[in-house]
Amino acid sequence: MHRVLLTSLLFFILNSGRAAEDKYSELGATYNGTICVDADTGIVLSESTADSLGHPASVTKLMTFLLILEDARDQQLNLNSLVKISKEATQIGGSQVWLAVGEEFTVKDLLYALMLQSANDSAVALALTRAPTVKEFVERMNTRAKELGMTNTHFVSPHGLTYGAGPHDTTTARDLAKLCVQLTTLKDAFTFTYCKEFNFRPGLKSVRLNNHNHLLNSYPGCDGFKTGWTVAANASIVTTARNNNHRVIAVVLGCDSPSGAKIAQRVRDQIAGKLMTKGFEKLAVYDAEKAKLLTLTHRDTPKGKGATPSAPKKSDSEEKTEEKGWLEALFTF
């Protein structure tokens, strides 16, 4: 009975009212796939062709980012340690911070360059701190992807900059969501993904970095993660926001527009914002219905002499499992 009520209420709320007028026309726009998930449980809140393959472009850097932060968490790496720049790191094109052979930067500074400027040279420099060769680091990326259940993902680079016929990094919207659910468990991640500006290499050769994720400024509560674009991959974004007690993650993979690349990037952001808004709306329904059911349960619980003893306090893992069960009951229909 409660399941029917939840389903009916959810359908009514999500289909009532008129949506705000879009700033950018989505007419003719296409994408490989989209998805929105609850970050705490991984429950899917909405999806569209989320298992279709696409090229992530610079969104690839999120796996490089994850591996570096996990190594730091496991005390295999100090974010304040210095990295000496090799020749190989200076020979990559595309977006960069123009690293020079012999320069030294902290791992932390290279992460800012990676996440704000989407610096390909920084991605190579970071990869070479954790493996003897870039190829071996990419093998680590693919191993970690399998561990996270990213079954349709294959990386060929630490940065996502590929040319012509490839090979290209390949993934799906669903797999990228799995990656970012893991990212949200790392306390240091948002230090970099929420940073809007950073002064890299202070001095005569200083580079002012500006975060490419425009939703940080336009979407309330947005604090990550990463955008990407190449001619071969089109425009992608994995983004996240927190609202009250909930965090959602939205992915738009391979967005293209007949109006050109710049509009495709704006449409990509617009779609991602809508996905997060709808996700929060669903979670608000969940909160309201859970509160109602808990109130009913509390009201019907015997009190006084002969009452059933209260249940022992649940552990964090038990509460998370219960939360996931509530969400599955609400959204699986």
Predicted regions and their residues:
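Sec-dependent signal peptide recognition
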Residues: 2-7
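Hydrophobic h-region of N-terminal signal peptides that target proteins for export
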Residues: 8-18
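Alpha-helical structural signal
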Residues: 10, 65, 111-112, 180, ...
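Hydrophobic alpha-helical membrane context
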Residues: 14-15, 73, 290
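Active-site-adjacent loops and short helices of periplasmic peptidoglycan-processing enzymes
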Residues: 19-174, 184-187
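Domain-terminus/edge residues, biased toward the C-terminal soluble/receptor-binding domains
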Residues: 150-154, 165-333
